Amino acid sequence: MTVSFDFMALSERERYKLMIGTIIPRPIALVTTVDEDGRINAAPFSFFNCLSADPPILALGVENNPDMSFKDTGHNIRMTEVFTVNIVSFAIAEAMHICGSKYPRGVDELKELSLIHI
């Protein structure tokens, strides 16, 4: 049996729900970045994967804000060209989920949630 979808006929939300429901298992990454002023940002990502080992290439699906401005992670990566991908364990799953909340730019989510930056 074959099932097909006309992605252009689906809303953005419907496409998202379809993708996250069919591409499994999907590990969750807690991506940390630092802005130009040295402030840490942390955000969860389920859209990431290894594309190549040689050369090492990692894909990270960074979305923009609704007004198309960069979210903190995208902004920081563009400014510093540095980010860290942390694989989320069950022990920090709740904190990771809270990191996905909308914090004002410049707020250190790790500090807010008592997570340690190494």
Question: What does each of the following model-derived ranges do?
Answer:
Residues 1-43, 49-116:
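Active-site-proximal mixed secondary-structure blocks
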